[in-house]
């Protein structure tokens, strides 16, 4: 009722290397910490910076430009990979992008049910909860309930579409623009949150002073 699940998850041929690389990185990290060459707190800070600030700021610029530039938005919806590359954001985990536009009638959210595929060039590193089995399974079976746990209550008359990322394809949500007619593109980008581009949140509402 008011929700659908787009399951197009072709992980055939999705080999072990990503997991192998992750294990090697973890082993190297443990060795460096053990030898006192790396401060674990400092490493956590770097990860948090890329997870919350550096990566998502790229996506925020894409969203803000789409909000203010109808021609760019049209290109973004038609060929997201090329339109995102126009702003200089491309690379590993972002070779084939699709933009999911939220509307007054439809709210989009994406998940990777089999692993943790995520659009690194625009959103940075995936948050821990995105990789968790609970999110990956429950977002498909009970999206409305899971979104409510994130503090995002979707009206019953609004359709929720859950998109399952593939090994080849990466999604990013284009959230609805808040009431910000007087905002510049740069100001709008500051309102775009990482979670609003995943679909588990909304953009920050503008302050009354604006």
From Swiss-Prot:
Single Gene Ontology MF annotation: nitrile hydratase activity
Superkingdom: Bacteria
Cofactor: Co(3+)
Cofactor note: Binds 1 Co(3+) ion per subunit.
Keyword Cell wall biogenesis/degradation: no
Enzyme class at the top of the EC tree: lyase
SUPFAM superfamilies: Nitrile hydratase alpha chain
Keyword Nuclease: no
Pfam families linked to this entry: NHase_alpha
Record's catalysed reaction(s): an aliphatic primary amide = an aliphatic nitrile + H2O
Keywords: Cobalt, Lyase, Metal-binding
EC number: 4.2.1.84
Binding site for Co(3+): 112, 115-117
Stated role: NHase catalyzes the hydration of various nitrile compounds to the corresponding amides. Industrial production of acrylamide is now being developed using some of the enzymes of this class.
Family: Belongs to the nitrile hydratase subunit alpha family.
Assembly notes: Heterodimer of an alpha and a beta chain.
Name used for this protein in its record: Nitrile hydratase subunit alpha
Lineage summary: Bacteria, Pseudomonadati, Pseudomonadota, Gammaproteobacteria, Pseudomonadales
Record gene name: nthA
């Amino acid at each position: 009722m008011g929700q659908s699940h787009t399951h197009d998850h072709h992980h055939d041929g999705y080999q072990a290397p990503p997991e192998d690389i992750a294990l090697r990185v973890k082993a190297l990290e443990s060795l460096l910490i053990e030898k006192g060459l790396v401060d674990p707190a400092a490493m956590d800070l770097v990860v948090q910076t890329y997870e919350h600030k550096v990566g998502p700021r790229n996506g925020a610029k894409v969203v803000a430009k789409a909000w203010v530039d109808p021609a760019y938005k049209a290109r973004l919806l038609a060929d997201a990979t090329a339109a995102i590359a126009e702003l200089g954001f491309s690379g590993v985990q972002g070779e084939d992008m699709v933009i999911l536009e939220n509307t007054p009638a439809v709210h989009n959210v994406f998940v990777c049910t089999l692993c943790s595929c995520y659009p690194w060039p625009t959103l940075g590193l995936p948050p821990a909860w995105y990789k968790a089995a609970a999110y990956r399974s429950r977002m498909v079976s009970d999206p409305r309930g899971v979104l409510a746990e994130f503090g995002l209550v979707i009206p019953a008359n609004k359709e929720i579409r859950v998109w399952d990322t593939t090994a080849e394809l990466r999604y990013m949500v284009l959230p609805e623009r808040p009431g910000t007619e007087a905002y510049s593109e740069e100001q709008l980008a500051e309102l775009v949150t990482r979670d609003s581009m995943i679909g588990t949140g909304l953009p920050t509402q503008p302050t009354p002073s604006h």
